[in-house]
Amino acid sequence: MIDADRLITAVGGRDRDEQLDRAIRPLSLADYIGQPTVREQMELFIQAARGRSEALDHTLIFGPPGLGKTTLANIIAQEMGVSIKSTSGPVLERPGDLAAILTNLEPNDVLFIDEIHRLSPIVEEVLYPAMEDFQLDIMIGEGPAARSIKLDLPPFTLVGATTRAGMLTNPLRDRFGIVQRLEFYNIADLSTIVARSAGILGLVIEPAGAFEIARRARGTPRIANRLLRRVRDFAQVRGNGQITRQTADKALNLLDVDEHGFDHQDRRLLLTMIEKFDGGPVGVDSLAAAISEERHTIEDVLEPYLIQQGYIMRTPRGRVVTRHAYLHFGLNIPTRMGEMPVAGEFVDDAADL
């Protein structure tokens, strides 16, 4: 199992960190940094919906963890001037759980369902008419006396978030009028996010210090903010409280986060593939067993950034490390790698192996 306190994981952390995350989240599209295409499109859609005094179309937001799906959902509600009710797929175990939330929505409210790909089929069936016709079909009674009744719902916007859009059923996916994919952030945008967060937290940070944190944050705002808080601790105890490039570098080296944003678990994954599987190809289940992790942890937490940076490829035969992985560890590149495809030639769908 992955360490819940792993510094550079993009999954949720400790309660204290989550409270600070909420404190530094942007509340409007004007404050939302990065994702320029998504921001421009959502600004247009929201302005149009408000002009018609209608609920915004149902919106699906997907992408790797930590890129701001929850933040964007809250911004949508804020920009629409409505309330937001938040829940998650695993929490909605029975149709009655969903019905209780839907019947308490006000007109044009936002219902945010995180991890929407984990909805049970029976709950998903109830959601279809609610999304399409704003009606709720519920069963009253049991056995021969059971009957179905329809309840009218006020117009609302469902915002679904998922890290695994491919696991959504086609009927559910087709009911979203707006689909947005969040991409990993570039270093410039992450530097701006770090500087903004530092200002909110009352920290003194130099641009070079913000850049140093940003370049090791794996393209993920949540990780950037978490690193900022740990560098703050280092600067407070072993420095003068000011975050410079040198301070950030020393702090992150102490925390075992290297210049590429890799920690010991990333390096363990890559070295396992190189040393135990000769660089691959290796199936994800075999890899999970070798490093004592769960399959979904590799697919959702460890792999995405390594693939995006070109250190791992998904091929029809399994996962394969690239030249970059050998160079990262100062290892000799096998001669056979001259015959291998370049990173990115194979599509992600190729390896559920």
UniProtKB/Swiss-Prot annotation:
Biological process (GO), any one: DNA recombination
EC number(s) on file: 3.6.4.-
Gene designation: ruvB
Pfam families: AAA_lid_4 (PF17864), RuvB_C (PF05491), RuvB_N (PF05496)
Molecular-function GO terms, alphabetical: ATP binding; ATP hydrolysis activity; four-way junction DNA binding; four-way junction helicase activity
SUPFAM superfamilies, per the entry: P-loop containing nucleoside triphosphate hydrolases (SSF52540), Winged helix' DNA-binding domain (SSF46785)
Binding sites annotated in the UniProt record for Mg(2+): 70
Domain-level remarks: Has 3 domains, the large (RuvB-L) and small ATPase (RuvB-S) domains and the C-terminal head (RuvB-H) domain. The head domain binds DNA, while the ATPase domains jointly bind ATP, ADP or are empty depending on the state of the subunit in the translocation cycle. During a single DNA translocation step the structure of each domain remains the same, but their relative positions change.
Domain of life: Bacteria
Role of this protein: The RuvA-RuvB-RuvC complex processes Holliday junction (HJ) DNA during genetic recombination and DNA repair, while the RuvA-RuvB complex plays an important role in the rescue of blocked DNA replication forks via replication fork reversal (RFR). RuvA specifically binds to HJ cruciform DNA, conferring on it an open structure. The RuvB hexamer acts as an ATP-dependent pump, pulling dsDNA into and through the RuvAB complex. RuvB forms 2 homohexamers on either side of HJ DNA bound by 1 or 2 RuvA tetramers; 4 subunits per hexamer contact DNA at a time.
Record protein name field: Holliday junction branch migration complex subunit RuvB
Residues the record lists as binding ATP: 24-25, 66, 69-71, 132-134, 175, 185, 222
Keyword RNA-binding carried by entry: no
Family stated for the protein in its record: Belongs to the RuvB family.
Annotated InterPro entries: AAA+_ATPase (IPR003593), AAA_lid_4 (IPR041445), DNA_helicase_Holl-junc_RuvB (IPR004605), P-loop_NTPase (IPR027417), RuvB-like_N (IPR008824), RuvB_C (IPR008823), WH-like_DNA-bd_sf (IPR036388), WH_DNA-bd_sf (IPR036390)
Keywords assigned by UniProt, alphabetized: ATP-binding, Cytoplasm, DNA damage, DNA recombination, DNA repair, DNA-binding, Hydrolase, Nucleotide-binding
Residues involved in DNA binding: 295, 314, 319
Localisation: Cytoplasm
